[in-house]
Regions:
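Intrinsic low-complexity, intrinsically disordered or marginally ordered coil/linker segments
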Residues: 5-198
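Short, Lys/Arg-enriched N-terminal segments with co-localized hydrophobic residues
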Residues: 1-3
């Protein structure tokens, strides 16, 4: 526990060569009945996993673009992390960067789904650099080597595809491609940024 520092609202701990900051309530010092725990531990959820993943990419690969989001639904939650090159192109899944990023992101998962038996199998957790246990309640953690839908890199791909005729309705001129892209949920600002790069 020597690697943890807590103040009123946040706490810090070291994991994977980095210092991470999470809400102070992630540190569990009592059980569900309020009795002090002999060995306190850190409990992270979907928001913390998304935040830690983004921090990892920004520190280790500042030249890459990263997004993170999380959702809660009946009986679970999910985290999606998106990483791409600075020009918006997909990150090569054979690259050292991708393998390291995907490995880190997946290390934060709370377990995995066993499709054969149709059950979710919780993992054993992991530990900080000084041995404090970390439990993750992020159930489904995904790492993607491309930008998320609606972002400017995704808008670049969409517009190029619309102009090149990669969609069922054939090639479109720029004006019609922009209208279609808006219909697909791309914002004016992301379309404008994409147009600068086409």
């Amino acid at each position: 526990m020597r690697d943890m520092k807590a103040n009123k609202n946040k706490m810090k701990f070291n994991y994977a060569g980095m210092t991470f900051e999470v809400p102070a309530e992630c540190l569990r010092t009592t059980d569900y009945w309020g009795k002090p725990l002999e060995t306190p531990y850190i409990n992270i959820g979907r928001k913390e996993v998304a935040s830690m993943s983004k921090a990892f990419v920004k520190k280790n690969y500042p030249n890459l673009l990263v997004w993170g989001s999380s959702e809660t639904f009946a009986n679970g939650n999910s985290v999606s992390v998106y990483v791409c090159n600075s020009n918006g192109s997909d990150l090569d899944i054979e690259s050292k960067e991708w393998k390291e990023i995907a490995g880190f992101v997946h290390s934060l998962s709370g377990g995995k789904y066993n499709g054969w038996e149709e059950i979710y199998e919780y993992g054993d957790g992991f530990v900080t650099e000084n041995g404090t246990k970390i439990e993750s309640w992020a159930k489904y953690v995904h790492c993607n080597n491309s930008a998320p839908h609606g972002s400017w890199p995704s808008a670049v791909k969409c517009l190029k595809g619309l102009i090149a005729g990669e969609y069922v309705f054939g090639p479109l001129n720029m004006e019609k491609a922009i209208e279609k892209a808006k219909g697909y949920g791309y914002s004016e600002s992301n379309i404008s940024k994409a147009l600068e790069l086409i």
